[in-house]
Amino acid sequence: MRIGGVEIAVARNQLKTGAALSYINLIIGNLIPLVYTPIMLRLLGQAEYGLYGIAQSIMGYIGLLNFGIGGTIIRYLSKYRAAGDRGREERVAGLFIKIYSVVCCLILAAGFLFAANLQIYSRSLTADEVATLRVLVILMTVNTAVFLPFSVFSSLVLAHERYVFHKLLGMLSSLAAPLLNLALLFCGFGSVGLVASSTVLNFITYGSYTAYALRKL
């Protein structure tokens, strides 16, 4: 596929601007925790923060079920886009959506299995804390599983070298997350509020990737 001079210039501009936004996002990502974390800990409390940390650790292991497929998706999508083979590009995207749908079921099964067997923490946690931990694990599991297939559209945006949109969306998400988290904590929603915040942001972020990919690519 021959690429015109204008398209090359646009691609270079996307790359340069995307790189600049990456550095800005990196700075934001390092500065925000310095301000956000102490406030969050004070509002959440050590005990509930501990529960949130345990739930995140459990989800870290469950998240390994995605097998690091993201990089593979981008590689194949970029390959067929460079070759100008729109048909294969769409088939690959569809294939990975199906694969992720299967992985989604595995994550749901693993998450609910963990949630049903949290009695192993009964010696170190109270009954109420175990109940809260169970709610957190279930919500995080559903959050991870439901949005996983839609990550294909994020990969599609990157494969088409739309770095500016991708990085801007990531930066806005990085800024919105602590603000929404603190708002929910001030309202007394605790650790469950943090998971709800993550769910809302995932819905907006992946919804934006999906809409952009379907309309612009």
Q: Regions from the language model: what does each represent?
A:
Residues 113-116, 126-150, 167, 171-175, ...:
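Alpha-helical transmembrane segments of multi-pass membrane proteins
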Residues 16, 145-172, 182, 192, ...:
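Membrane-interface junctions at transmembrane-helix termini in multi-pass inner-membrane proteins
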Residues 17-22, 42, 58-60, 99, ...:
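Short alpha-helical transmembrane interface motifs in multi-pass membrane proteins
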Residues 95-124, 179-183, 187, 208:
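Alpha-helical transmembrane segments of multi-pass membrane transport and lipid-handling proteins
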Residues 14-78, 107-112, 143, 173-178, ...:
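Signature of the first transmembrane helix
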Residues 2-4, 11, 27, 73, ...:
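C-terminal transmembrane helix end/exit motif
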Residues 1-32, 87-94, 131-133:
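N-terminal membrane topogenesis motif
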Residues 8-13, 45-47, 62-102, 119-124, ...:
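Transmembrane-helix boundary and interhelical linker motifs in polytopic inner-membrane proteins
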